[in-house]
Amino acid sequence: TVKPGDTLIRIGLDHGQNWRDIIRWNNIENPNIIDVGQVLRIAPPSADPSQEIAIAKPVQLGNVSSPADEKKITPPAEQPTVSSVRNEGSDESFQLIWPAQGQITSSFDDSKNKGIDISGKNGDPVLAAADGKVVYSGAGLRGYGNLIIVKHSNTYLTAYAHNQTLLVREDQSVKKGQKIAEMGNSDSEQVKLHFELRRLGKPVDPVKYLPQR
């Protein structure tokens, strides 16, 4: 069930989907408001019909709680088979590069930190950790500042938060190692890159997919 404060952008991130696709799949006329009692499809119409979520309360796009206070939305969908995961970027084949050169200042913690924080200076380059397509570029999620979300497959998304400058737009294809932003401290008390990896919408430790330094 969607909690008060959730938005289409948040729902997309938590379910590994492009929020604009969710708008299209549900024929939503006004993306700024989700109605009471509305059931949202979070997969294409041809997919499992069980991938729907009920709305608990109307919310506006800009009214988003801090990531530290949020709870994940768990979809009732079936897990993909081993073969389908392997075809769409399996654990065995999916590898990232470091999105920034700084040191890790905050490690992954599923209950407290949905990603890792990497230190740096204003203007330091932020790189795409793998090939993919930009599904979000903006500042619509409170607590993330200037945010970029890249979809790499039906399985994996990466998120890059607190940037000073965003250098890519939505629907743009990016290559591994491409500069997509400049590090900053938007919606943060210090300059850093908050980097998340989502597998089927669930936060996982990106360090397990990164090369050792």
Give the positions of each predicted feature.
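Extracytoplasmic low-complexity/disordered linkers and repeat tracts associated with LysM-containing
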Residues: T1-Y144, I149, S153, R169-K175, ...
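Short peripheral tails and domain-boundary helices/loops at the edges of structured domains
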Residues: L61-I73, A161, R198-R213
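Active-site region of chymotrypsin-like
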Residues: Y156-Q164
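Conserved, short, structured surface segments that act as functional micro-motifs
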Residues: Q172-R213
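A short pocket-lining beta-strand/turn micro-motif at the edge of beta-sheets
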Residues: Y144-N146, Y156, E189-L193
